[in-house]
Amino acid sequence: METVQSAHEYIEHHLTFLTAGDGWFGINLDSMIMVWLTGLVFILSFRYAVTKGTKGVPGRFQCLIEIIFEFVDDIVKEIFQAKDKLIGPLALTIFVWVLLMNAVDLLPIDLIPALTSAVGVEHFRDLPSADINITMSMALGVFILVLGYTFKNKGVKGFIKELTTQPFSHPLLYPVNLVLELVTLISKPISLGLRLFGNMYAGEMIFILIALMPWWMQWALSVPWALFHILIVVLQAFIFMVLTVVYLGMAVEEH
């Protein structure tokens, strides 16, 4: 019974946020701190690559940055057909930022909580992409961008026409079209945020459960899972970035 209780307390400790405020007005400070830290790492690393880059033979870090840049640029050019100066930098920012947030999950599960406990902070969840508030906020930001691009390129009348005249062309079915299209429109940011949250939360839980096992089982299970989780970390950042570009491409696409 004592073992079960201690396991329960361990899991509860790792799943409790450092929160300021209550209810709807509460803010998960740990998630916000990690979001800003990973964002700072992104900015400083790319700034370093640009300012310290050599015109001759580039270093390893510069090569890595160039590979990421070209990778994202090729995807954007393939998906987003219109000309827009914002989409490329936006896609690069989303991919690298989400990748860095996800990569925090590859750190030892007790490392950052132990460091924060040493300075008197009892609870600190270090994986921001396992916080549904963070993932849904990012998805909401994408949704607002999609609406902005839609109104900019199609206008209010074009947007309403798009919602009411497809998939059925008969005027009597316009109300049905409106309901179907609104459901589709709203489901995009919801699925975008929940997909990232669900995958990263599940990965975090598996690491926590592995940490509860005997030390010899931890090594046998944590290394294979960490190697597999690298794929999940990269894949989820890639999916979030690609879907963002796809949705923005649909917003400027003429039907």
Curated annotation (Swiss-Prot):
Keywords: ATP synthesis, Cell inner membrane, Cell membrane, CF(0), Hydrogen ion transport, Ion transport, Membrane, Transmembrane, Transmembrane helix, Transport. The gene is atpB2. It comes from the Bacteria. It comes from Vibrio campbellii (strain ATCC BAA-1116). Belongs to the ATPase A chain family. Key component of the proton channel; it plays a direct role in the translocation of protons across the membrane. It is a multi-pass membrane protein. GO terms for biological process: proton motive force-driven plasma membrane ATP synthesis. GO terms for cellular component: plasma membrane; proton-transporting ATP synthase complex. It is found in: Cell inner membrane. This is ATP synthase subunit a 2. F-type ATPases have 2 components, CF(1) - the catalytic core - and CF(0) - the membrane proton channel. CF(1) has five subunits: alpha(3), beta(3), gamma(1), delta(1), epsilon(1). CF(0) has three main subunits: a(1), b(2) and c(9-12). The alpha and beta chains form an alternating ring which encloses part of the gamma chain. CF(1) is attached to CF(0) by a central stalk formed by the gamma and epsilon chains, while a peripheral stalk is formed by the delta and b chains. The chain crosses the membrane at residues 24-44, 86-106, 131-151, 205-225, 226-246. GO terms for molecular function: proton-transporting ATP synthase activity, rotational mechanism. Pfam families: ATP-synt_A.
